[in-house]
Amino acid sequence: MAFAISKRNATLFLVTLLLISVPLSSSTLQQDFVKCLVDNSDVSFPITASFFSPDQNATLFKEELESTAQNLRYLTPSNPKPVFIFEPLYETHVQAAVVCAKKLQLHLRLRSGGHDYEGLSFVAEDETPFVIVDLSKLRQVDVDLDSNSAWAHAGATIGEVYYRIQEKSQTHGFPAGLCSSLGIGGHLVGGAYGSMMRKFGLGADNVLDARIVDANGQILDRAAMGEDVFWAIRGGGGGSFGVILAWKIKLVPVPATVTVFTVTKTLEQDGTKVLYKWEQIADKLDDDLFIRVIISPASKTTKPGNRTISMSYQAQFLGDSNRLLQVMQKSFPELGLTKKDCTEMSWIKSVMYIAGFPNSAAPEALLAGKSLFKNHFKAKSDFVKEPIPVEGLEGLWERFLEEDSPLTIWNPYGGMMSRISESEIPFPHRNGTLFKIQWLSTWQDGKVSEERHMKWIREMYSYMEQYVSKNPRQAYVNYRDLDLGTNEGETDAREWGAKYYKGNFERLVKIKGEFDPDNFFRHEQSVPTKIG
């Protein structure tokens, strides 16, 4: 005898199976959450595969918790763990998760790519109990060449977005991140810089619409959320205003031929002199040219302890090598770029080159969605308004040679970045910025040497204060740094807020207070509902 089972009855049946299978020691909170999901979600799903908890399966829970975490410093046994991890399969599940977390007084942490530098997408030091809503299953990307746009769901990585664009066209791209495993949900909400920023601005500058879930569990698009909230979510930092479900992004034109190169200089090859020249011209180069500098200690010989400083100039040029060589000869001959240093390729292959993939890798490698580099690390950031003098660089090299595995990456500004108002979106670092610095200290032995490395990067950061932006000393919110202050700390939010957002911080606070007055979406450095 044939019969039909409704979606709701099927879901109830699955819930019953789940609750039967959960040991008695399992969290009652998870059971209550599951029941609430059924009452508030109208789409059935394999619920047993959408939850991960230590009571059900400690091994799977650990694997899921660690699956996308970029900073291993926050995966030690002493770090707080969520009661469970929930992976929504549909947008209505996200709505229900917000409603149920609010009802059960559970704190939410939202994770798309897991790249938060201070682990705020998967660790909550001051909020218990907390759960993670992991958006990695919401990863559809729909490209529409007729409108030069695409809808990208929050769980998609930047690499997936790039891949789906090039599936449809070899002459369209999107100006976002250099690291292909970044989740686009959290990436764009912090601004999102990349190798085409000098030509087209930030990723957030090229957002046309968005879909979010607010603190009441409602799905809102740009029209429904209003222009103030739409302004706030494009650079105002993750975890403050709602759950990003999807972004509508504007595609940009890219040439059929893109040229890349990497040229490395050391101290023995007049590296400091060449870098000082780069500081003076990097923001003034042709808008099609992006040259970043990756700086770290390197061995001069095979003898241990015999180290120098390596400065690798890595570039993407939106054009062929002949035109690139003309630009370089005119603007930066000191680098000594030659034809054999240059490699012509498609835009998608240039994205992979910058991200660190081997030349032999096919574009499908972008779909893996896993980070190529994981470490214990501490990061900081700076913006530079005047060239750092040679003596300042030499002092920096002395400090770098004292540390095991330091790294700094200098990204040029100028071009379109200087032509967009600093209040256009919350990201304010625009005209007058020569370049942005990312500081990193990395290590592999966990807690054993953490204190030493943290001490080093803080002292180095203090040394560099004299050479970087002032009043305020600016920072990039996607390089989250809790040393700047927290909502529960002694530092006034206006101090760290001004570092990230400058004069835009007060507007963000006003919007937050009106849109999420109960501060449901919060973390250690979220935008507060009020200040002072």
Curated annotation (Swiss-Prot):
Signal peptide from the UniProt entry: 1-27
Record-linked Pfam families: BBE, FAD_binding_4
Gene Ontology MF terms in the entry: cinnamyl-alcohol dehydrogenase activity; coniferyl-alcohol dehydrogenase activity; FAD binding
Glycosylation sites per record: N57, N306, N431
E.C. numbers: 1.1.99.-
Record-listed cross-link 6-(S-cysteinyl)-8alpha-(pros-histidyl)-FAD (His-Cys), residues: H115-C179
Localization of this protein: Secreted, Cell wall
Domain FAD-binding PCMH-type, residue spans: 76-254
Any single Gene Ontology cellular-component annotation: extracellular region
SUPFAM superfamilies linked: FAD-binding/transporter-associated domain-like
A Gene Ontology biological process term: polar nucleus fusion
Names of required cofactors: FAD
Cofactor remark: Binds 1 FAD per subunit in a bicovalent manner.
Enzyme class (EC, first level): oxidoreductase
Keyword Secreted: yes
Similarity comment: Belongs to the oxygen-dependent FAD-linked oxidoreductase family.
Purpose of the protein: Required for endosperm development and polar nuclei fusion. Mediates oxidation of p-hydroxylated derivatives of cinnamyl alcohol (i.e. the monolignols p-coumaryl-, coniferyl-, and sinapyl alcohol) to their corresponding aldehydes. Can also use the beta-O-glycosylated form of coniferyl alcohol (coniferin) as substrate, but is much less efficient towards cinnamyl alcohol. The electron acceptor required for these reactions is not known, but does not seem to be dioxygen.
Protein name: Monolignol oxidoreductase AtBBE-like 15
Organism field: Arabidopsis thaliana (Mouse-ear cress)
Gene field: MEE23
